[in-house]
Amino acid sequence: MKKVAIIGAGISGLFIANLFKRNSNYQITIYDKNKTINLESGYGIQLSINSVKLLNKIEFNRFQNDKKFNPKKINFYSHKSLNKICDLDISDFNYEDCKYTTLKRSDLINFLKKDLENHIKTSHNISKIDQDNQIIRLTFENNETFDCDYLIISDGVFSNTKSVVENENIQPIYNGSLAIRTLIKTTQDFPYDKKNISLIMLKNAHIVIYPINKKDELNLVCIIRQKFLKKIDLNLLIKKEIFSQNKNLENLFGNHLESWPVYVTKKPHRSVYENSFYLGDAFYTFSPTMAQGASQSIESAYELFNLLSKDTKDLQNVYFKKRLERIRLVNNRSRLNYYSFHLSNPLMVTARNFLLKKLTKSEKFLNSYLGNIYQRI
């Protein structure tokens, strides 16, 4: 039986742990540095069908129905008014029990960890990693040690374990924007479609709103281009950058606000150990403009599990090359979206809106731009 150590109890780490748990050839232990698993209960996520299909392998299709939502469209709006530019029918990519899904991150985490409680050890932070004859020895700050055959690192964008493995201080880079999120409880006068995804494109900013369950709760995320500052007056920033463009948006930001600087990965790393692998944000963190963060975490976990279970030769290189190819595909689209969502020149905005009307109805374009991502696995 092979021993597998998984560092980080996030989406990718918990998902691959579920896959290993269903295979008697592996013994898993999940380590997390926090005292409790971070649920981030107010945080909504989107899952495209490439990840929903994989989650169904661990019975996500039986997930409590009122705690998730299946939007059918993305509605595009400009900053000038509440009039819709066009919409994109994402349900065209759906099939049977595999549909574009939105939900709270905390609900997905609870689903992923419900059968793993006996395999999770919290308050474990790695201080040292050694290898001897293909066995990796982990030493934690509490002086506990653990020997494993495979080490899977999924402790997020600020992965401390990656720095220990590579023996260098590896940090993500600030991408020049700030993310703000809040939860909205829909009312009769809510100006947008509460059953679908709304994308409001502004000058140097954009807002995404989508339902996260069948209880009329919506997640709002606002991305604003902003130089890095340690202290920011959120209300003043929103008033200056958002409300100045459209006062109709004021009622969207009345609830509790949370914010964080957006970091992305400078470049992916191939682990120095042949039996150690990076997953999720520890491998690569995308700009949040393609809604593929969670889906790519799930996809990469399934990809790695498949390669390991098939005893693939030259495993490290095969996995890294597959992930690198996938990253480039998603990242190119994320960067293009980031640029096009934030246009400020009136002529460019007019041209973008015209193209959106055409492209969102072009089957050939959508199959290339989205289908290559949504339908890969």
Describe every region a protein language model picked out.
Residues 353-377:
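C-terminal auxiliary extensions adjacent to catalytic cores
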Residues 3, 26-27, 217:
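Residues at the starts of beta-strands that form the adenosine-phosphate
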Residues 21-41:
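Glycine-rich FAD pyrophosphate-binding loop
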Residues 12, 36, 158:
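Conserved Rossmann-like nucleotide-cofactor binding loop
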Residues 36-54:
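Conserved N-terminal glycine-rich FAD pyrophosphate-binding loop of Rossmann-like flavoproteins
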Residues 5-23, 152, 257-343:
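Conserved mid-domain beta->alpha element of the FAD-binding
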Residues 84-100, 104-109, 185-259:
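Conserved FAD/dinucleotide-binding core of flavoprotein oxidoreductases
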Residues 4, 21, 48-165, 170-183, ...:
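Conserved N-terminal helical subregion
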